[in-house]
Structure formats: structure tokens, C-alpha cells
Amino acid sequence: MELGKGKLLRSGLNALYQAIHPVHGLAWTDGRQVVLTALHHNNEEPKFGNSIVVGQFEHVHGLYWGPFLGNDTPALLAVQHKKHVTVWQLCYSSLDKNKLVVSQTCEIGDPFPVLPQGCTWHPSKDILVVLTKRDVSVLYAVRYENTSIKADVKSSGLIHCACWTKDGSRLVVAIGSALHSYIWDSKQKSLNACAFCPVFDIGGYICAIESTVDSQVAVSTELPLDRICALNAGIAFDVPASSEITISSQPGLLLMEEEFSMDVVQKSADSGSLTTDSLATSPATLDLTHIVNHSKADLNSLLNMKKKDYLTGSGQDSSHLILVNFEKKVTTTRRVSIPGILVPDILAFDPTAHIVAVASNTCSAVLVYSLTSSSVPNIQQILLEKNERPKGLCFLTDKMLLVLVGRQKTSDPAFLPSSSSDKYLIRLMVKEVMFDEDSSASSGGNTSVQASFDSSMSIQDKKKLVESLYKEGQSAHREILLPGGVAPPTYLRKKKLIEEIRSYDGDQSPTSSANEFDDKRSKLRVESLDTEPKNRSITLGLDMDKKPNSRPTSPKSECQKSSPPNFIKHGEMSPQQEILSISRNVERLCCNFAHLQQHLSELTDITRNGKRPLSASYLPCRQAPYVTVVCQDAYHPEGPAMKRSILLCDNKLRLGTIQELFGLSLIEMQLGPSLWIILTGDSEGFIPLTFLANQEITIRDARISTTHPPLSMDRNNSLQPSSSVT
């Protein structure tokens, strides 16, 4: 179902969270309007009915239905804006059953913006939690007043998301990498920190949280990018010891060295415990986290790629889905790696089939996991188009998943987004959940392998099983190992995990990327390897060889291949030549900056006027409009003055042009017989005045005229205009 154009948040949003009401249907927004769409489904294909607009605001970031308490109780709808949340009551008129009556019941505001997933309702009571990055507010009387209380958040970190447990006894707030647990006291109307485990660290930055069954929650953690996106390539990879380095006699090849390790990582936080029990790696996969960083002299040497399994990974090399139980003591019951999704900020759970859907606002894939097995297998992958992003997930039934899809316009990756929201073409899509065991084989490895790694197996049994699988899979084709030790699904094997913004110089060939490896070969060729980052900045005559710059150049360098910069050699040039070269380079940079300002000015005109200025409106050269600028000597106004003719631009003058022409930083212009004004510039650099063609204006140095008046003249006389002024 197509919903049209809409403006939604870029990240951290699940637009279908608490968005379906059994009576009023689906609540959705295009960024301004609140729309209700009828939804009919009885374990069959869902059917969407008519849509009505019940409200319109300046900004709408999210809609959340309150708990369904019966047909006789009016429904509550929370509308999330930028820095406040309004709660509305909806019911049908007693006189006209088809007339919907909407009225506001309460409102809460905060100095900080509301988080993208900033509201969550109690599962069985009219209690609304509103989240900002610093505060957790609880509105417990939303039908009558704005009364609220705030939780005592003792952490200095930033709040990201929160949810109530399914039984409604506990509010779990995600702050950084820790879960803060609060107990709701309905009599005292207060949130109290959990007595036995108020804070539980799970070892990864939390992206999303969703209640599952009873007092259990599902948590997704993001891939820590600081491990793979470091400034120095040596920081981005784990380098093995020197004794493990093997050099091949054939240059240009990569050797694969098989090595398996088995570790059990246990981590405790407060009174809770965290036991990591990850999945097995699929056979014959390559671990790219052990590339040896050779020196520049060893460019012809070979790189060693270690073979490693992640039966019990540390949780620092992948995004994860974690199940946390809050019954008697906090325990992490299950943990699974999420392949191919860096920031899994969308979670949806179905209590009937015990399945979890995981997605990201920045990735076009949706993964479905089953919680019935201790291995938490991936049973289905849903792949959207390249320019489509999931903006919301929810289960209609145990076999139907509703996906809100946002299609983006193709944008230039060289420009980073400047706002937290973006425009999308929105549509609703229903996907059937497949429970076929064969469908889970492509989830990143052998399903039987994953199901075999039950927590009841001993470490020795696991090691024997992995070794046997490895021996059987030696002849199989090799694949690139995704972070977390899980092989990529079929739809991700030939795609990049991270799309990098690269700009290559004319003398540098791009380094081979992960998707260029042929998975049918056991020996992989690398076109070019350079372990030391090259300095791509424009040389200004400084000794920058000692400190290379690894930052990428701007796209403008792509156009300068024909004229590479002249690198200065200190031993061949005199100091005067070096200074001259530096000044020329500085002038070139200033010129480029001036062109950039001009382009920005054109973009501003396009944004304001909706069209590009036409060059056809330019006048012929013989009819060039210009003004004559007379620069008066402040000490001798009656003496000779400098005159320059300057071309007008739409009857406007650039202040910077006059400043550069006469060497003045602060300029005064004569406006009347006894009035001088100091000139300023607007956002585009123009003097905020219009001039006529062939007009003559008089200016002078404002600093000298105001601070040092001429001694031989009367102050009033110094303000008299020159006789040459017309």
C-alpha cells in the first residue's frame, strides 16, 4: 500500500512500534499529519481500508497507541513532536457511530529533544514514559492532567531507548552499554531502582530494546566502529605475533593459515552475570581481522589471514542480539551475532511464534530470528531495494510481518546529511514469515551447526565438532567472514559492509576491497597494497613528509589530475622561491575558496527562489553597468584620490572586492553632505544596498577617519563631500 511522500527520522526510529489499535487501525504520519488507516486481518491476508486525517502539526516524529482496555474505554494516542509530547483521546460519538471525536488530554515538554523512539506505553495501564537523552518522565494520569514524575538516573551517559517488560512490573532503560532497571510503585506513584541489580552492563552500545515474554527483554547492540574505522590502519586490525607471521616466496598472494581457538568469556556486572555463548562459524571462512601490517619495504611480501572461529567471541567484533532475563537475577540467556547490519536499531517481537525481526534504518535488509531454539537461528532474510530502508516493523500475526518501507532519493554520498530527518516515499509491505528449516541455511552458515551448539554441550565436544567440520569443509569454497564470525547470507556476499567515500589521486590505484575477492579461489591476488597512508593534501612548502595525512581529499582533487601539485624540495629552491611558491599556493587556495563561496551563493539562490540564475540575463559588454569608487585620503580629503570602476552584479557591490582593491579592512561610505556610514556585508558578501549604473561613490578608511581625525582641519569640515562627487 502506497502512503505517499513523508518526512521521517533518519535513524533510531521504529514507526510501527505500538502503532496498531484493534479498533482504530494503523496510526502513521508523513511528518506533519496524523493519519488513521483501517486495518482488517483475521489470520488472513491483511486488508487496508479508508484513511482519515485526525490532526496536523508542524512536526510529528512518532505515534503510539495506549493499551487497549475495552471497546467502552476511549483510546489514547501519544503524538511525539520535537521537544514535547501530546496525548489525545479518541472515541466515536454516541449520537453518530461514524463520527470520531478527538480531544487532547495532556501535554509534556522538555528542554531536550525527545528521542527518536521517545515514547513507550505500559502494557496494561494508562502510563506513558517519555524519554530524552537526560531524563525519563512518567505520566501516570494522562486522561486527566499533566502530572509526571522523573526517574532518578544516576548515570552520566546518554539515554537511548527504554521499554516496559511484558508483565508491566519493570521499566528497563538503555543508557550507553548498560541496562538500568526500575520498579514501578503504583501506590506511591514512583520509579524505584531495582534492589538486586539496578545496573547491568551487556558489553556493547545498545541500539534498540523490545520486551518479549514475562520479564525478559531483547536488546540489540551495534558494531563498535572504533575497531574498524581507526585513523591508522594498524589500529583497525589485530596483528598477530611475529612468530605467527609466515612469508610466502610467491609475491602477490594471500596465504590462509588455519587456527581455531575456544574461549569462554564471562563478565559480571553488579550482582548479574553475563555469559557469552556465540554461534559457530561456517566452514572455510576467512577472518579479515588479522591482516599483518607490513612496513613499506615489505610491499612485495605476503599477508597472512588467520583462520579463527567465534564460538565464544568477546562481543566486540559484531552487532549482537541479546536476551536478558530479569526474574530472580539478571542473566543473559542467549546471544547471537547479527551479520551485515552495523546498527540494528529496529526490533519487533511476536509472542505467539517467539520470533524477533531485526533491521536498521540505514540498511536494506531485515533478518528474522527464532527464539524457540537455544541457538537462535536466523530463519529468514528480507531484502529491500538498494535505495529503500525499513522505517518500521511489527508482527500482525505469527506468520505475517508488516514493514514500513521508505524509498530515498539518490543523493550524493560526498555530502553528509545535515538534518536528523529525510524525505521518503512511504509504502506498507506485508511479508510472510517462513518457518522452513531449509530457509535458515542461508543465514550465514550451516543451520545444523548452529543448532548443535547448545549450552549443554561441553567445551571439548564443541571443539571436536568444529575440528570435524573444518576437515570436511577444506575443499569447499572460501568466503569472507563478517564481523562476529557468521558467514554472510547469499544476498550480502557480493556487497560491501561499509560504503566508503574515496577519492583517488592520479598516481594511486585503489586498494582491493573485500567484495573483490573471488570466493572460488583459495589464493587471492591483491592489486596494490600500501600500508602507509599517503599524504594527499596540497603542499604549501611545509615539511609534511614526517607526518602523513590519511584523510581523504575532496572531490575537487579528481579534477586536478592533469595538473598535479608541485611538491617543493627544500634542497633545490632558495628561500625567496619557497616563499613565492607558498604565496602562489595560498592564492590558489583562496581562489578555490572564492569559487566555493560563489557556488554556495548559487545554491542559496536556488533554495530561496527555486530556480538557478540564468546567464542569459547578462547585458552586452558595451552596456556593462558599473560604478566609480573614489577612495578619499582620510588625512587629506581635498588631495588626489584613487578611482576605480567596478562592475555591478544585479546592482550590487561585493564588499570584499572593494576591501581587496583599496587595501581597507573597515570602509566608510559618504551617504550625504555630512553623513558617513560604515559598510557591512550580507550572508553572500554583498553590501546591503543597490547602486545605479555610472554612479560615483566616495569611500575612506573608517579606522583612520574615526580614531585619528586630521589636526589641520575642523572635524565638521572633514565630513564635507569632495567636489568631484555627483
UniProtKB/Swiss-Prot annotation:
Coiled coil: 581-609
Region (Disordered): 503-571
Full protein name: WD repeat and coiled-coil-containing protein
Ranges for the WD repeats: 55-98, 154-194
Organism: Xenopus tropicalis (Western clawed frog)
InterPro entries with a match to the protein in the record: WDCP (IPR028041)
Residue stretches of biased makeup (Polar residues): 506-515, 550-565
Record keywords, A-Z: Coiled coil, Repeat, WD repeat
Keyword Disulfide bond: no
